[in-house]
Amino acid sequence: MLIFEGKEISTDSEGYLKETTQWSEALAVAIAANEGIELSAEHWEVVRFVREFYLEFNTSPAIRMLVKAMANKFGEEKGNSRYLYRLFPKGPAKQATKIAGLPKPVKCI
C-alpha cells in the first residue's frame, strides 16, 4: 500500500497497483520517482502505449511482446530492447507496467 495525495492506494508486495482504476498521471510520476525515474516524453510514450495495450488485450505485455508491439507502432528505432532498457533500466516490461498502474506481466520474474 502507498499513500498518495492523502489516499490509500492498494498495491501488491512489489508495488504494482491492485486496482488499475486508481491510476492517474500524477500517481505515475510518484511511482516513477520511487523507481528512480524522472518521466520524459519518451517514457510517457511507452507508459501510455502499455496502458492502451492492456485496455485492448486485457494483459500487461512481457518484454518480447512489448518490443514487438512497440516496433509495429513506432518503428525499429523505439521498438527494440536497447531503447526500452535505456528508459527503464530495471526492466521495461516491469517498470513501464508498474508506472502505468497495471498488473505485473505474467512472464516477468
Swiss-Prot record:
The record's SUPFAM superfamilies line, in alphabetical order, gives: DsrC, the gamma subunit of dissimilatory sulfite reductase
What are the catalytic residues?
C108
Asked if Nucleotide-binding is a keyword of the record, the answer is no
Keyword tRNA processing included in the entry's annotation: yes
UniProt-listed GO biological process terms: tRNA wobble position uridine thiolation
Q: Which family does it belong to?
A: Belongs to the DsrC/TusE family.
Please explain the role this protein plays, according to its UniProt record.
Part of a sulfur-relay system required for 2-thiolation of 5-methylaminomethyl-2-thiouridine (mnm(5)s(2)U) at tRNA wobble positions. Could accept sulfur from TusD.
Assembly notes: Interacts with the TusBCD complex. Interacts with MnmA.
Task: Please state what the protein is called.
Answer: Sulfurtransferase TusE
Species: Salmonella typhimurium (strain LT2 / SGSC1412 / ATCC 700720)
